[in-house]
Amino acid sequence: MKLTCVLVVLLLLLPYGDLITNSYIRGAARKVTPWRRNLKTRDVCDSLVDGRCIHNGCFCEESKPNGNCCDTGGCVWWWCPGTKWD
């Protein structure tokens, strides 16, 4: 029973290992993790319409220097201010 509980806990925490562990290895910053890359490409700021990055009802204007998450090439941050992730 104890072994089963340990395995269940490990399986639940395994996908979130990058959130739990330190983001630096031997003083060097780690590269973008698959978890964060997946979040960027799949779920956040998934379309650029009229210079605005649209996601979950939020938008970031191109002309706004503060909190801007978009440019003409698309999203430049992995989150937009005002989304459900804030």
From Swiss-Prot:
Tissue specificity note: Expressed by the venom duct.
GO cellular component: extracellular region
Location, primary (coarse class): secreted
Residues cleaved off as propeptide: 20-42
Signal peptide start and end residues: 1-19
Coiled coil regions, renumbered to chain: none
Record-listed 4-hydroxyproline modification sites: 65, 81
Pfam family, one: Conotoxin
Family as reported in the entry's similarity comment: Belongs to the conotoxin O1 superfamily.
Role noted for this protein: Mu-conotoxins block voltage-gated sodium channels. This toxin reversibly blocks voltage-gated sodium channel in cephalopods, with no alteration in the voltage dependence of sodium conductance or on the kinetics of inactivation.
Free-text note regarding domains: The cysteine framework is XII (C-C-C-C-CC-C-C).
Name assigned to this protein: Mu-conotoxin-like Cal 12.1.3a
Source species: Californiconus californicus
